């Protein structure tokens, strides 16, 4: 929070100059000198749009349309400085309050200002004491989104040093406390009914996090969330010195996928309660590119759910009995497990296992960034009307319209068995031999073989 104090002191110092200036004199004449002084204090180029001083009902200085930084990456609509009038005649000058309205800044800009040493550390005489600072309608500006608006109350010690700050979103759903710690700032945040302001609009029933923020990184060792009927506990680190780097891990338990899955992966249609242990990392030049650069890996298990848009059991039973399969339907399961690798918007599901009553299936499926499917599922149906056989199904189509078709080897084996031994038993024996030989001689994909065990 050093940058807030520096900003307040910079404008507060101007009041000492303005005491001797008649209030009817246009203050725009003094803008170049004022901009120069504030720039020197902040260590950033500063541009001011307008100044106005008033005596009644209390002496105040209003500064409007402020830009700081070479690219204007700090912007303020208005700053109102209210001094202790009589202190302006002596030293130090006391500023009762500084109100900053409509602040917009990038993380990098705030990091630059926060890294500046306060005047006392640089051996300068402290000529201005600020008693309180308040922000309204502030926003943290990202490349394609903004965090906020939020309000903040900043408490200062008797010597003007930063003591603590409380930040609240305009709707009151998120509250954060900040105070100095370990050469940076300790951050503790709490939220209820809060929606992510950037990225997928995930809604948190409850969110609590604790961590330490520095000028170029923030590390959160405790993250606890309740969402979609389950909970997530984890840790994360965000760095922004050269580009944006995000890393972390989490434990996910009992999260219902029906509403959450489409928010994370477009067109994903699945329900059930998820258990997972993801480890993730992303590095990008800009924050907006993080999603595309994300790499996530996790074992997973989904209980009591449904895969919508495809009926694996029906496809396997119809093909096994030599009937034509039609697309669509759904696959209910007691348990779906496997291993997921997400990398640059492509999903690889390996070590897949599906269990549900008469259905047992395993295999691997990949989803391209364009939502195209590829892979193979081996399905086995236990039914009185059909002799049990494992049916290998090639997976194709898209996430919206998946297609399951028997492999060429399975079709050929089933046809040969039928020709030699007749339909029914002959078909099953021929198909089984073909499937077994296929698995023995290269039937599994390389990615399925190399996937780590759970």
Which role fits each region the language model picked out?
Residues 60-62, 131-134, 159-166, 184-188, ...:
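Short, hydrophobic/aromatic-rich segments at coil-to-beta transitions
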Residues 5-66, 71:
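N-terminal amphipathic/hydrophobic interface segments
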Residues 1-11, 285-288, 292-293, 324-454:
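Extended terminal
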Residues 51, 61, 83, 93-95, ...:
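Glycine-rich, small/hydroxylated-residue low-complexity segments
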Residues 45, 71-83, 143-158, 169-175, ...:
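Amphipathic hydrophobic-ligand
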Residues 117-207, 344:
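Elongated, acidic membrane-bridging lipid-handling scaffolds
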Residues 52-112, 122-140, 163-165, 288-290:
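Flexible beta-edge/linker motif
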Residues 51, 66, 79, 98-103, ...:
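Solvent-exposed loop/turn tips at the surfaces of repeat/solenoid architectures
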């Amino acid at each position: 929070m050093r940058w807030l104090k520096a900003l307040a002191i910079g404008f507060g110092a101007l009041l000492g100059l303005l005491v001797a200036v008649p209030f009817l004199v246009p203050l725009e004449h003094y803008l170049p000198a004022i901009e120069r002084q504030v720039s020197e204090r902040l260590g950033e180029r500063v541009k001011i749009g307008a100044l106005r001083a008033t005596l009644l009902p209390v002496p105040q200085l209003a500064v409007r349309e402020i830009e700081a930084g070479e690219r204007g990456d700090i912007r303020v609509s208005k700053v109102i400085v209210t001094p202790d009038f009589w202190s302006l005649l002596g030293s130090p000058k006391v500023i009762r309050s500084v109100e900053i309205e409509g602040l917009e800044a990038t993380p990098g800009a705030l990091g630059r200002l926060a890294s500046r040493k306060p005047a006392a550390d640089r051996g300068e005489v402290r000529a201005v004491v600020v008693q309180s600072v308040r922000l309204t309608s502030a926003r943290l500006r990202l490349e394609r989104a903004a965090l906020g608006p939020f309000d903040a109350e900043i408490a200062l010690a008797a010597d003007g040093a930063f003591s603590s700050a409380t930040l609240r979103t305009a709707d009151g759903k998120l509250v954060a406390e900040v105070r100095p710690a370990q050469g940076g700032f300790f951050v503790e945040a709490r939220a209820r009914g809060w929606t992510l302001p950037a990225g997928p609009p995930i809604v948190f029933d409850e969110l609590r996090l604790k961590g330490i923020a520095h000028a170029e990184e923030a590390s959160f060792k405790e993250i606890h969330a309740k969402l979609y009927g389950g909970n997530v506990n984890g840790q994360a680190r965000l760095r922004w010195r050269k580009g944006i780097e995000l890393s972390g891990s989490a434990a996910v338990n009992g999260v219902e996928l029906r509403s959450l899955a489409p928010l994370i992966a477009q067109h994903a249609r699945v329900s059930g309660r998820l258990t997972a242990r993801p480890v993730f990392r992303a590095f990008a030049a800009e924050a907006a590119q993080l999603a595309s650069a994300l790499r996530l890996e996790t074992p997973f298990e989904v209980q009591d759910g449904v895969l919508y848009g495809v009926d694996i059991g029906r496809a396997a039973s119809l093909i096994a009995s030599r009937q034509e399969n039609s697309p669509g339907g759904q696959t209910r399961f007691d348990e779906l497990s496997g291993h997921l690798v997400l990398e640059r918007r492509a999903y690889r599901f390996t070590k897949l296992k599906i269990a549900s009553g008469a259905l047992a299936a395993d295999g691997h499926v990949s989803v391209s960034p364009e939502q195209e499917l590829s892979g193979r599922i081996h399905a086995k149906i236990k039914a009185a009307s059909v002799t049990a056989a494992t049916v290998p199904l090639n997976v194709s189509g898209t996430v919206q319209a998946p297609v399951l078709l028997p492999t060429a080897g399975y079709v050929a084996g089933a046809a040969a068995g039928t020709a030699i031994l007749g339909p029914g038993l002959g078909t099953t024996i021929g198909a089984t031999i073909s499937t077994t030989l296929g698995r023995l001689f290269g039937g599994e994909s390389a990615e399925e073989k190399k996937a780590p065990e759970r």
